């Protein structure tokens, strides 16, 4: 069971041929912000998985995830407005950031696997008109950090160091290792 409203996470699981169902946890992410970025995404992933695990009475394994971009020590979730997205991109263009995704898998027998995966992202040096055109697509408003690697935002990324799928919202290599553990 995927405890996430993210279409990108669903697509990753579908493309990897991992059977799943979706149940959105309803965890209010906006009320939880008093942690550093790594602890924040881990806390939210665990909260999402825990809520859904309880709702389905532990009948299926539950995967919760949450992602943020850390840029210059600041946490960037989804930008609220086009103005905010544009302002962030002005800062991010030509610079490195860290995309953190917290993962939590709760098995039917109550075993908890929990880990945060971090991928370093180098954003392309962009002109004001490139930023304006990208923000006008609306895509930056849908994603943590204000970009979708699997969409037009992929054109705005120069280089990645770490897990590619993590930047989309879910580390498939981590999930594969975990599925091997819980299926032993």
Curated annotation (Swiss-Prot):
Report which reactions are catalysed by this protein: a ribonucleoside 5'-triphosphate + H2O = a ribonucleoside 5'-phosphate + diphosphate + H(+); a 2'-deoxyribonucleoside 5'-triphosphate + H2O = a 2'-deoxyribonucleoside 5'-phosphate + diphosphate + H(+)
Q: Which GO terms describe its molecular function?
A: nucleoside triphosphate diphosphatase activity
**Protein's organism:** Prochlorococcus marinus (strain MIT 9313)
Please list the coiled coil stretches.
none
* Top enzyme class: hydrolase
Q: What is its main location?
A: cytoplasm
Alphabetical GO CC annotations of the entry are: cytoplasm
GO process terms (BP): nucleotide metabolic process
Domain of life where this protein originates: Bacteria
Identify the catalytic residues: 66 (proton acceptor)
Q: What's the stated role of this polypeptide? A: Nucleoside triphosphate pyrophosphatase. May have a dual role in cell division arrest and in preventing the incorporation of modified nucleotides into cellular nucleic acids.
Record PANTHER family:
BIFUNCTIONAL DTTP/UTP PYROPHOSPHATASE/METHYLTRANSFERASE PROTEIN-RELATED, BIFUNCTIONAL DTTP_UTP PYROPHOSPHATASE_METHYLTRANSFERASE PROTEIN-RELATED
* HAMAP family in alphabetical order: Maf (MF_00528)
Query: Per the UniProt record, which residue ranges are transmembrane?
Result: none
Task: Tell me the cofactors it needs.
Answer: a divalent metal cation
The protein's name: Nucleoside triphosphate pyrophosphatase
């Amino acid at each position: 069971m995927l405890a996430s409203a993210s279409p990108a996470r669903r697509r990753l699981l579908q493309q990897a041929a991992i059977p799943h169902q979706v149940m959105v946890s309803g965890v209010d992410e906006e009320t939880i912000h008093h942690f550093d970025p790594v602890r924040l995404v881990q806390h939210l992933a665990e909260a999402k998985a825990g809520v859904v695990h309880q709702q389905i009475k532990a009948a299926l394994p539950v995967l919760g995830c949450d992602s943020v971009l850390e840029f210059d020590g600041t946490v960037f979730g989804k930008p609220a407005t086009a103005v905010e997205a544009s302002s962030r991109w002005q800062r991010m263009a030509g610079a490195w950031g860290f995309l953190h995704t917290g993962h939590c898998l709760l098995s039917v027998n109550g075993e908890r696997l929990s880990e945060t995966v971090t991928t370093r992202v180098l954003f392309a040096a962009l002109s004001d008109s490139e930023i304006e055109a990208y923000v006008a697509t609306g895509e930056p408003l849908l994603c943590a950090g204000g970009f979708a690697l699997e969409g037009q935002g992929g054109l705005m990324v120069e280089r990645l160091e770490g897990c590619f799928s993590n930047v989309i919202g879910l580390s498939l290599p981590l999930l594969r290792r975990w599925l091997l553990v819980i299926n032993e």
